[in-house]
Amino acid sequence: MPAAATGGALLIPPFAEERKGVLPVYVQTARSLADAGIAALLFDFYGCGDSDGDFASTDPAAFEIECSAALEWLAATLPGLPLFVNGARAGALLAARLAAARGDVAAAVLWSPVSGADFARQLLQRHMVNDMVAYGKARESRSALEARLRQGQTVDLDGYPVSGAFYAWLQELRPLPLAAPALVFSGGHDAKTAEAFCGGGHATLPDLRYPPFWNTVGHVDTRGLAAATVAWLRALPHGRAVAPCLPTALPASTQTAELASFGDPEEPISVIWDLADGPVRGGALFLHGWSGDRTGPHRMFTRFARLLARNGFLCLRPDFIGRGLSGGGSGDASIALMTENAQTALDALRRRLPTGSPIAVVGICSGCKVALTLAARNPEIARLLLWSPESMGSLRSPATGLRKTFAALKNYARKLLRPETWRKLAAGKVQTGMVAKALVKQEKRSAAEAIREDAALKLFRGFRNPVCFVFGGSDPDAPGSRAAYARYCHAHGIPHETHLIAHAGHSYYSERWTRELFEASMAFLT
């Protein structure tokens, strides 16, 4: 929010895991818009991200109502100023619908729009690929899954319970000509859908290519997309600069959660407090992975923190610097900085808890390295819960990277057996650079990082509170990490237990796997 705004932009996210990939780009764009005098509002749909509710219970018809309500709030906060909408992927189609339905949208920016039917098809394809990795074959064909959805059944698509109603709604989500000025980016991915917005003669399609950041592990350079978006919106006619009507701002807390920030005001750590229901029995600090945010993969952190809160835990979920809604850029992130952020968060949790309350730390993926280092420095941490921990320091064998590369090769080999893969290769629709990165850049660490990890392991030898390791059966790193941590804990007398969730991947992309993970985790923590 700029001190004096000349316009306002509503940023409409995509669905499912694409929301996680788009979030860093939206945060970067929102900050650039604010620097240009344009206020930006980013929200989560009901049942998504940090919002209330479960995805399974969402009413798809409400998505457009939520978009309209968010725009109404922006209009009330910035009376008389022009309003813009920016949507990504399926969110781009919602942005276009919003612009068509309301007369107060001055312009629209659409990033890589995808029709609802194509998005549904991609969800199903991704589910089948993950099924093949987990079970060696797809247990259901796409046509069988589609038939179940058309019958109104709910299908678990990689941790998201997709209802028949949501699937039917997606089939009707199509591009439409725009009457308002529009900037439509295909990025080199789906030019046909992008061109479908040009029927009204008001759309511009710039030739800007970028990787599929909504579906990419890790962080990619999207500065060109953000800069082009801001430059185009900035060049449009704006209103006279006014100070936002902050009294109409949304509250920073609800009955069950609080949004807050602490640390350096220039680079604040953005956090969510999930408030305990009833007397506080303890606290829980959640530490996300390298490319994630405080919601966790398919909202696992959001959901598990709320489960703990209902059982009397005060939970704190921070975004590390350079991630999520915290300050800094993606290039600022490092394991060392993540550990500093975690210490700041732990201190804040201690101050808020009743004296002597036990604190548990929950980490996933790279967040487990941070959790272990934090516990080594704070041995009073009562319990350490590590989901899919990577091997650290000298515990990591040279075979770790080879196992992951081999698993990736098997995955791509399966894809090469499909006719549609060759059609995409011929059409230039496969990001070969991203494939190469996945195959040859597996988990490389600097010598300095390895030394820091060994120093943390040396200090952690004295930790004497319970540790729980949880691994997925199809995670290629699980066998080595599981054995290495078991040897380490046995050698140094650290009380520990290990759970293996059969067939699960690194991020437990299944409602059944997630349920089993939560049950084991609750048994350990309570």
Regions found by a protein language model. Name each.
Residues 86-95, 362-371:
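Gly/Ala-rich beta-loop-alpha elbow adjacent to hydrolase catalytic centers
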Residues 97-101, 373-377:
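Active-site signature of alpha/beta-hydrolase-fold catalytic machinery across serine-
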Residues 2-44, 277-320:
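Short, surface-exposed "cap/lid" segments of acyl-processing enzymes
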Residues 1-7, 231-282, 510:
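N-terminal cap/lid segment of alpha/beta-hydrolase-fold proteins
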Residues 16, 45-50, 115, 291, ...:
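Alpha/beta-hydrolase active-site loop signature
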Residues 49-80, 323-355:
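Catalytic nucleophile-loop/oxyanion-hole region of alpha/beta-hydrolase
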Residues 104-230, 380-518, 524:
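The alpha/beta-hydrolase serine catalytic core
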Residues 84-87, 111, 361-363, 387:
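Short beta-strand immediately N-terminal to the catalytic nucleophile in serine-hydrolase-like folds
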